[in-house]
Amino acid sequence: MKTHYRVVVIGGGIVGTSILYHLTRKGWTDIALIERAELTAGSTWHAAAGFHALNADPNVSALQTYTINLYREIEKESGQSVGMHMPGGYSIATSPQRWEWLQAESAIYETLGIGARLVTPEEIVAECPIVAPEGLLGGLYDPHEGAVDPHG
């Protein structure tokens, strides 16, 4: 083992492995990752691993969209599944204030090109029968919502 590296990454969780991955994509070779156990065996392994592109901050939304696309790219490059499951997701409103907020957010997401759309209570219940329709005013559907398997 070498005694000197240009970069040493401490921790092989999602952040450490992402740093190492991106450095190697930039052509860096004088780098090392140090992990005390198995890769992703710490807090990353216990994560819910859910993600979405919805965020009113365009920078955060761009980062979240980049992450979703990166997982797809890694699967394609490696031929290995990351356990990605992208069924989409709903944010629902049961109060007039929440419904107004979702409508305003929808307009922001439209300008960001995210592709989220407002949905009726009937659409939500048809897709998610476990949701009680009583008091449901509507919702916002995000087609880019899903999860990956953090330990597989």
Give the positions of each predicted feature.
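Hydrophobic alpha-helical packing residues
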Residues: 23-24, 109
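FAD-binding beta-loop-beta segment adjacent to the flavin cofactor pocket
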Residues: 40, 126-133
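Helical element adjacent to the flavin cofactor pocket in flavoenzyme catalytic cores
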Residues: 141-152
